[in-house]
């Protein structure tokens, strides 16, 4: 294999693809990236048996071929090369020569035969969606994906496509996030995408470009400009999320989002990794009063907000509360409550583009 390629194109591609590379694997090739030089394109792939990222960049190919190179080392080399044009050449001993300006490297590669094939699958459904919409949907829900592997199904989000509407639902047992957008698609299907995959999708999405999603029985493929991201789907039964949203609402308040975030953030100063005291919220009259008491002190605050319905005193984990508030995209939110032990519901003042639920913490009588 012998080729010339622009360093900036190569560095960006290697950086993005390397996120799918296994940091430690019993298969040495999976700690590398696969380079394939054919035609006028250099194909670059990373794969950890759960998620694979592939892209193609323009290159001047003098000799076709394939090689697997250490992802960590190759990324560092490319990032620090002095000139814009990079020459990459391999020989029959799997030695890779990398030259740029006066700098040159010789590193040991591996045969592409040792690299596992990325999955292929039969498409059962497909969807095309604006990159901006998909980015906002994932960003406003992925925070609620569980990191507890005892229930693997909740380490991903449910993509629920029906009635020309796509909903993304994430839940971890303490909070739930739902985001929806209308789409031009007649399919009725559900599938569960791992949270890790969604995080990688976020880093690649361009707002101006559409994302094409191909769904199979066990795998999903996201096509984002020149990048292809293939991932396994999570298998199992997802919670009936519609039934978990409380129907009754005894208390409602419309609150400025930024003011609410600031108040909860101030209470959070008394909490830390080892301290988890609830933020106490009292909804009454025309204000919401906040307080927090922990082993290191006390704090109080209040903000103006017209409260309709019954007065209520309720407590929340500050981090869960803030995560929900920071991932809405409206200046004001509607807070709905059904007593001190029922989840808080956060929705837009108008419409139903998102729903966030936060389970309360029991309060002591102190």
Language model: regions and residue ranges:
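Structural preference for solvent-exposed beta-strand-turn elements
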Residues: 1-366
